[in-house]
Amino acid sequence: QWLHGTPARNLKAEVTATLNSTAAAFKDYENYDFTDPVRKFSEVELPILKDKSLDNSGKLSFNQKLDLSNKAPGMLKATFLTKVFEGGGDFSVDVFSKTIAPYAHFTGIKAPEPHKYDAYFTDEDVNFDLVSLTENGKPAPNRKLEVQLFKMEWRWWYSRGYDNLS
């Protein structure tokens, strides 16, 4: 709508989305980590709509499936930039963000308090809590999970490589 209330009908519009990784927590599970530290995700900008027109009431609906090829480490934040072009070429801009769940289920891990220097001793049992949730944060019971535990080796900062998760 224009500022005076009439519909902005039949104007050209375009929408782009910028995706970033976010550490969004689920309600009641704020102490759990739902991010995969092995997956790297760089900011990506996607064209969503280009050269589409608003209808007679000044609206435009769209549904877009984002193919991320299972590269997202967890929840994503999508920032949408919309532009609506006037007949003379000027445009109005709107920006809004939404959290996007790239997966139907998420597994979270809650680590116990570590010892000094954020370490766990290898000669004692350490219990981690796991939870499986739907994309809406509801418990997803009876899901089979495969869990692997890795011992991290300490390195000097200058000998760090991509094979080092710490």
What are these regions (language model features)?
Residues Q1-S166:
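A structural signal for beta-strand and strand-to-loop patches characteristic of beta-rich domains
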